[in-house]
Structures are given as C-alpha cells and as structure tokens.
Amino acid sequence: LLTGTSAPGAVITIAIEKSGNGQTTADAAGNWTLIWTPPVKTGTWTITATSGGVTATQLLRVQLPGNVQRQPIIEPVLRYGTPEISHPEAYQEMTDRWRIAPPPYELTEKVQGRAIGKQGGTLDPYNQNLFKGDLPIFGKDWFFNFTGISDTLAESRTLPTPSGVSAVKPTSITVFGKDNQNLFNENLIASFDLFQGLTAFKPITQRFKATLIANLNYVHLRENGLVKPDVRRGTSRTDAQVSLNEFFYERKLKDLSPNYDFISIRVGSQPFNSDFRGFLFNDTNLGVRVFGNFASNRYQYNLAVFDRLEKDTNSGLNTFELRDQQVAIANFYWQDFLVHGYTQQFSVHYVRDEATFHYDRNGILVRPAPVGIFTPHEIRATYLGESGLGHIGRFNVDHAVYYVFGHDDLNPIAGPDPKLKDGDGVRIGAGSAALEVSYDRDWLRPRLAFFYASGDSTPRDRKASGFDAIFDSPNFAGGGFSFFNRLGIRLAGTGVALVERGSLLTSLRSSKDEGQPQYVNPGVQIVSAGLDVDVTPRLKAIFTGNYIRFDKVQSVEAILFQGNIHKQLGTDLSLGLRYRPLLNQNIVIVGGGAVFLPGRGFKDIYEKDRPLVHVFTNVILTF
C-alpha cells in the first residue's frame, strides 16, 4: 500500500524500479493511495511519483519472508570455511557473516584511498584475508592469524664508561674513559595464532599460538673489556639469536553466564603483565595461567605460576634452559570501583630464586652478583600490591602501592652476620609507590607523576629495606623515552648496575635479565612533569622532565668505599615522537632524544658534570 499527498483531483503516476507503473487520483483533500500488485523482489528500489510535471523520488526497502538471498556483490562463494552439507539440494544458500560486505568507506582521507569491504588477497591485510583471521580456515569456527613484524632500532648515547690499564688510548688510563656508545638491534618476528571460536565478543574456545623471533644486535663502545671480559676481543660485538619466545595452548574451561563470563587456562610460554604499568612483573615466560571474569565482566582475575626460562644475554630473548626461579601471582580486577571509570587491582606475588652459579654469554658472572660476599644464596619474597587505573571526573589517575617481605639467605652487600646470632640471612621489608595524574584538554594531556622506592639506610643491620621488583618494565615517567628509564647505567668496578635498562629502580643488580633481586639498595625518588601532544592524527609528541634522587645512599657508599655521596642524581629531560603515516599500526616510526643533567650525587660517583645525551630511532613494520 503506497500513500501520499498532491493537489486535489490530480492524477499521480507511480513507478517502482524493475516492477512497472501504476496510476491513481488524489481525493478532495489531496490524499491518494495505491495498492501495488506487481511483484517486487527483495532489495532497495527507487519509487518515482509524477504529477503535473512535478517528480518526486524515494527509496523503498523490501524484505520478503523466507531465506535471505546471496548478495551478487560477493559472488562467487569463497572456498574457505564453507559448511559441509550432507544433502545440498535440501538447503538454500544464505550469506554468512564473513561474506556480508560492509558499506564501502575510505581508510584514509584521500579520495583515491582503497575501499574497505572487498575480497582481499593473501598479502592484503586491509580486506578480507584468510591468514588474518577474517574467514574460517577450516570448518565453521577455526581461524588463523599470521602476524609478521620487523622491529629495527638504532641508538646512540653517552654513558659513564669504565677504563683501565688495557685502555684503547693512553689518554683513557683513568677510572672512566670515552663515553660514546652505539647500538643497532633488529628483531624479525613471526607469530602464528590458530584459534577456535568467534572473532568478536565471545571468548575463544581454544587456541594454539607460537612466536618465533630472529635477533641481530651490534654494539660499539670506545673502551676495551666491556663487550667481553677479554680485552683482546676489542670494543665492538655482533651477535645473533633465534628464539621460540612464545608458545602456548589456551582452552576455555567453562561458560559461567549468558553474558560471556568464563574461566580459561593457558599453558606454555606466554606474555603476562601483572599490573597496569609493568612495575613488578612484565615478561613472556614459561608458566600456567588460569584466568576469567564474572558479574558481566565487572570482575577479572588471574592465577599464574611461572618457572622462568633463562634469558639470552645480548638479545633478551628466552632460551630453553630453566633458570631456577619460580614466580606465583594472583591478582583481581574490580571495574567501576567506587566511581564509574576507575578500575582497582589487588595482587599477591611470590618469588623463589634458588641459589645458583651462572655466567652470562659474554663470560661475566651474574649469579650471585659479583660484589661483596658473592656466594650463591636463595631468596624467598612475597609482594602485596594495590593499584588503580582510570578516570575520576576529567582527571586520569594511575597509582600503585607495593610492600615486599621475605628472606635472603646471604645478601652480597649485607654480608654475613657479624654477631653470629641468627645466621647470615637478612629479613626483607621494603615498599614502593607510584602516582600519575593527567588531564585531557582537546589535543593536550599535561601530567604530573611521582615514583618512590624505599632505600636501605643501614646495609649491615640484617634487614633489607631497599625495594626491588621481580622483572619490571615500567611505562611511567616518560617510559622508554626517558634517559634514566631506557638506559642501564653500570657502577664501575662493582659488577652491578646503578639502574638496569628498562627500569626505574636503583637496585644494584648484576643483571635484570639474569641476576637476582637485590633488596639492599639506595632506593629512588622521581618527580615527573610532562605533556602529551597529539600534533596531528599521525604524529604524537611526548615531553617529559624528571628530577631523580636517591632515597638513601649508604648502600652505594658501602660498595664504592666512598663517603659523603649526595642524594641528587640529576634531571632527565626527554622528547619522544611517534609517527603513523598510514593512521594505523602497520608502519610506526618512533624517535626520541634525551639529555641527563648530572646532580651532585652523580658527580660524586662518576666524576661527570657535563650533560649525557641519548638519541634513537625505532621503525616497526607490521603485517
């Protein structure tokens, strides 16, 4: 039934596309109706009404009862993922969800951009692709996703570099030599992900995943005895490594509600970040993890146990050798905690690091740490943590608080008990806190942050009160753009580092990858201010300034046999740029520069008062 209005007594001619014509006459009030009898097929058709030389058009959508016919735009039927039918003649073909072409639209703002929604090829990640999880690879719900990544890093920096009698140049026979260093690192990553389930909303039923990484790294320094203990090996090193870094099987154990609440298990080498910012444990390693949610996803939880694999020294990738360190983690997430938009987390971490003796690939002793009394010792520590992430009104708030307690059989800096009362062990008791507050205003995000890790003021009092993490990788206070966070700074002549690469903690560890946690350390205080700027949709700039100081200095003085070291480490100024030329993650170019202005404490330790600089470029190509 078609209706409309026109001039009283006017004759109206109606035409429906591909269905013929009809006529009717308007009544005295100007209203007209027409019962359309010619057949109209399912589809969208144009209706044309003509009266007295005036023409009006309108679209008509027709949906007839019965099966939906296959759309001509997506013929022919793809041979992948077609359901097996025992009697095809008893069925009428219907369009499935993977072959319904979405409306065409452009990925970029350019008019000549390629439209989305077309059948793609094997090497086309933007349109439907069998190898990107867009179509079932077999059956009705088995999908395969291949990801290939090239991660290329070039870096140049100046760092305090120890020298000695075997120096490259006669002018370098002092405590510190030439400080220029260069690094090149290339990772080729191939990830294979086969999973059963749906591509959205519903949790995956089961999954097999493996990730291969081929690494090539080159480092060049200006002094001998650093890339290898043997000074005859020169000042540069080239190394390569291939690692099966990630391999696991995941299985959904049970659906808990109609709202996709579930419980699943994952077994194998798998990535896991135990909190929002990676303050305590952020690693890909061998373990078993049970995880899930309930109450319509308002609550999530993880129960995980890791028996960690040894890391390769120069690439940081996993090997197949167990390192005799076990980690157990339980955490609980509560969304909309007290206020909407804020997620609270509670966690318990336990680490047992066994007494072992281990040299890294470069021939350097890393367990136990070659400082003080370097005797193999066992560490057992428990971390209690509370953290949160979200927004309160217009303010973005991120915080974390941790307390660690436990026992270290023989801390190398504390040494044996001089009173011979309770053995040579030390009691661990230390804390850490972090807070960041930011405010989004249009394309600007100013932020303020504070980070604190307690230090040990009395290294030999049988209580270790310096905070250290299990395996941290924090994205905080400038993250990887910060000089202090990004670059490891060694303590000359001690075999330990003031701070490890990719860490904020002045933990005095021999190595973050291969060494043991070290709870007799100076701790650190960091006050940070920054500004994130979305310059364009393609370009983001990150400005950060950090003021850094020791919490306590006594443990550093004990190692260096040097008194009156000041607490001020220095000021870290950094700029980071992230550029996405295609407005997606397929090509990402990251660059940055940082300047470290030494404070009085840094000058006391390294005899350096001129600024240290760091620049890098990182190109990430993803398929």
Regions found by a protein language model. Give the residues of each.
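Outer membrane beta-barrel
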Residues: 187, 191-312, 433-486, 570, ...
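Signature for the C-terminal beta-barrel architecture of outer-membrane proteins
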Residues: 259-262, 270-463, 527, 534-539, ...
